[in-house]
UniProtKB/Swiss-Prot annotation:
Taxonomic lineage: Bacteria, Pseudomonadati, Pseudomonadota, Betaproteobacteria, Burkholderiales
Binding note for cofactor: Binds 1 FMN per subunit.
Subunit structure: Homodimer.
Disulfide bonds listed in the record: none
Top-level class of the enzyme under EC nomenclature: oxidoreductase
Binding site for FMN: 10, 16-18, 96-99
Cofactor requirements of the protein: FMN
Similarity comment text for this entry: Belongs to the azoreductase type 1 family.
Enzyme Commission designation: 1.6.5.-, 1.7.1.17
Reaction it catalyzes: 2 a quinone + NADH + H(+) = 2 a 1,4-benzosemiquinone + NAD(+); N,N-dimethyl-1,4-phenylenediamine + anthranilate + 2 NAD(+) = 2-(4-dimethylaminophenyl)diazenylbenzoate + 2 NADH + 2 H(+)
PANTHER family: FMN-DEPENDENT NADH-AZOREDUCTASE 1, FMN-DEPENDENT NADH:QUINONE OXIDOREDUCTASE
Protein name, UniProt field: FMN-dependent NADH:quinone oxidoreductase
Molecular function terms, GO-annotated: electron transfer activity; FMN binding; oxidoreductase activity, acting on NAD(P)H as acceptor; oxidoreductase activity, acting on NAD(P)H, quinone or similar compound as acceptor
Annotated SUPFAM superfamilies: Flavoproteins (SSF52218)
Amino acid sequence: MTKILNINSSVRIGDSISRKVTTEFINKWKAREADAIVVERDLAAQPLPHIDGSTLGAFFTPAEQRTPEQAQIATLSETLVRELFDADVIVIGAPMYNFSITSGLKAWIDHVARAGVTFKYTDKGPVGLLTGKKVYIFTASGGVYSEGPAQAMDFNATYLRTVLGFIGLTDVTIINSEGVAMGAEGVNKALAKTSNTINELLPA
């Protein structure tokens, strides 16, 4: 039984391209494996607090020494981390906002990328602790950034691949829905291409 963590980060709830394609992917997976468990983490419907000094203080204080306030702060991060460790497959909807990820997704990363929890430092360098999992990232962007002259401006997929790899999530497939700001034809073309990719990834 596969456990899937589905993370959506678009602030657009009703007409989001990234939400549309992650839903299509999840539905396709469920059609193949009806008993798969899907855990939803919606970073727009349930936004996470951005980390501050109090958050860092809680993270770096041993659990047995935390104040009640620090314990409460750390509980949220520990819940998010547990969702990652429990998942076999991680699906991330990651629209590009100003060449990078959404602030909500950055907040999630800051809560889960923690030294001694999801990665550790060794004498040979940092080692990610979230291993043996498959990640699918569904990006959406108004222009085309996976190739061509704008490729150097992609700090969305490239950043996610880097930071996820740092915590051990190295088996990453990125599916881009690009050119969605180029009118209805651009949207339809992007969605059709993504649907074809999903069918290739999850053949019937």
